[in-house]
Amino acid sequence: MSKKDALSRFLFEKSAVRGELVTVTETYQSILENHHYPEPVQHLLGDLLVATSLLTATLKFDGDITVQLQGDGPVRLVVINGNNEQQMRGVARFSDDVKAGSSLKEMMGNGFMVITITPKKGERYQGIVALDGETIEACIDNYFNQSEQLPTRVFIRTGLQDGKAAGAGMLLQALPASAEHSADETAEHFELLTQLTHTIKAQELFTLDTKEILHRLYHEEDVTLYDPQPIAFHCTCSRKRCEDTLVTLSKEDVAHLLQEQGKIDMECEYCGAHYIFTEEDINNINKLSSSNLH
C-alpha cells in the first residue's frame, strides 16, 4: 500500500540543521494522468515536482512558487506550480524527438531553471540558474549555492512502485550560527548528515514510514519530527478564468472559432478539463463585460 502524500519537517536537536521529507507519489500520478509523456519526460516532471515541493516548504509566508525549465531541446518547457499549502500541478511541452533514456541535457538542450516566488503580500522574487547540472537535484543545489542562502542540499528519488510512478525526496538545511552552535560545528555536522542522507534508497522513501526512515538514517542523532502537512494535486483552472481569457480576444477571432466549430472548447493543459462555450454563452459574457465597464 502506498504512502499518503505529505511533507514532514524535522530538526536535529543537537545541531543547527533542519530537514524536510516529502512523498508526492499520488500527486505525481495525477500530473501524469490524461497526458502521454515519454518516460524521460515523466521522470523529469517527477524530479521537478519533488524539488518544487521541497522548495515550497522553505517558504515562510503565504504565496505561490513556480519552477520552470526552459530550453531549446526536444523538451521546450517543464513547469511545476505549488503554494504554501502544498497544492501542486505541472505540465510539460515537448516534440516527438524525445528518445528513451535521454539525459537532462539531451532533453532540454541549452536552458535555464527559473524559480519564481510570489508572496500574497510583498514583492515577487525570481532566481535563474543555468541547467548545467546532470540532474534536477544538481541544478537545485547550484541554485542554493548561487543565491548565497544557507547551506542546503536536496535528495530526489523518482521511479516505479508497484508498477506506477512514484516520487519522494529530502532536504537538509543548515541554520544560522548561534551561541549554542558555531558556524564550523554546524558545517561539519551538516556534511556528516549529507553523507548519511545520500545513502537513502528510492524504495525506502516510497514505502517506509517517516519515523522509520529517520531512524535508519540518523539513529545516533536526536531528531524531533513535526506533524505532517498533506500534499495534493490541485488545478487552479476554472470556467471564470476561461471567460476572462475570451473577453481579451477580438470579436473577429471569437466569431471565426464559432464558425469553424460551432462552439469554443477550451482545454486546461494541466488537468485536461474542458470548458465549452456556445454562441449564446459568448453573447452573455460580452453583455456582462460591457455592463461592468459602465
From Swiss-Prot:
SS bond list: 235-237, 268-271
PTM annotation: Under oxidizing conditions two disulfide bonds are formed involving the reactive cysteines. Under reducing conditions zinc is bound to the reactive cysteines and the protein is inactive.
Subcellular location: Cytoplasm
Record protein name field: 33 kDa chaperonin
GO cellular component, one term: cytoplasm
Family statement drawn from the similarity comment of this UniProt entry: Belongs to the HSP33 family.
Alphabetized InterPro entries for the sequence: Heat_shock_Hsp33, Heat_shock_Hsp33_C, Heat_shock_Hsp33_N, Hsp33_helix_hairpin_bin_dom_sf
Entry's Gene Ontology BP terms: protein refolding
Protein's job: Redox regulated molecular chaperone. Protects both thermally unfolding and oxidatively damaged proteins from irreversible aggregation. Plays an important role in the bacterial defense system toward oxidative stress.
Keywords tagged on the record: Chaperone, Cytoplasm, Disulfide bond, Redox-active center, Zinc
GO molecular function per UniProt: protein folding chaperone; unfolded protein binding
Name of the coding gene: hslO
